[in-house]
Structure formats: C-alpha cells, structure tokens
Amino acid sequence: MKVTIVGAGNVGATAADVIASKEIAENVVLLDIKEGFAEGKALDLMQTASTKGFDSVITGTTGDYSLTEGSDVVVITSGIPRKPGMTREELIGINANIVKDVSENILEYTPNPIIVMVSNPMDTMTYLALKSTGLDPKRVIGMGGALDSSRFKTY
C-alpha cells in the first residue's frame, strides 16, 4: 500500500510516523510546499526505522506530485491554522484554495484514491474535495470527528 500525506507540519509528520511505524503502508510520501521541509521530516522519520523496527519507506518532496502516483490513500493536512481574530469565513476562503489545488494535483497522478481530509474547517474542506474531485462519496472521508472524540476522552 502507498499513502501520501500532503502537509508535513505536526499533524502530517505524526501521521507519517504512525503509518510507517505500524507498517500500515510500505511507502509513505510526505509532500509540502515549503522548500526542504518534507524532505527533512522524512529523513528524521526514516532514521528512527532501525530503533522502531519498521521497513516502510518515507519519502519527502517539495511540491513534486509525480511522487504521489499510485497512492491508495491521500491524507490532506495542508492549510493554514486559524489565527486570532480570523473569522471562519476567512479561514474557509484561504484553505479552500489550498485544498482545491491539492485535490486537482493529486488526481493528475492518482485518479481514484481514498482521500482522508484533516484540513480545517474539516467538514467544509471534505465537501470541497468531494465536489472538486468528482470521486465517489465513499472515497472522501473527513477525519475531524475522531480527533474531537479522542480529545474529549482525554479530559
């Protein structure tokens, strides 16, 4: 199995670490727009393979969507976080452009992936990814509810 994670920040890098460590996928691609960021994260994570005992391969790339070709699952974590004073409408406007662009680039190399949306606001971004890709609704999944449930269980 091949999993691509778009967005190499805290959530994306953690997802890559868990997927590789548990050997959920043989190949994990970590993609980001910040020059060298995903490559550095991937290298850091790969250097833990000998101590964690996993054989998955993590590859980082700066915007090269060709490396995502053949992905079974694409996890989208990209977008900006909501800043103090920012309205949800402003966040939607910015992240909608990012998610639409990511979705179109992914489909160029992987025509029928399962998309797991993590970008905020998750419900709106999931709907946007569904509409912009034309994928079967069963292949576009929003992940926010599980995260919120986990947070509630913690407290």
What are these regions (language model features)?
Residues A8-G9:
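Glycine-rich Rossmann-fold phosphate-binding loop(s) that bind the pyrophosphate
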Residues S78, M117-Y155:
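Rossmann-fold dinucleotide-binding core
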Residues A16-D17, S103:
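Generic hydrophobic/aromatic pocket-lining and core-packing "Φ" positions
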Residues S66-I115, M125-L128:
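Rossmann-fold NAD(P) dinucleotide-binding segment
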Residues G12-A13:
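N-terminal Rossmann-fold NAD(P) dinucleotide-binding loop
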Residues I33-G70:
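Conserved N-terminal Rossmann-fold NAD(P) cofactor-binding segment
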Residues M1-V3:
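Extreme N-terminal starter segment of soluble prokaryotic enzymes
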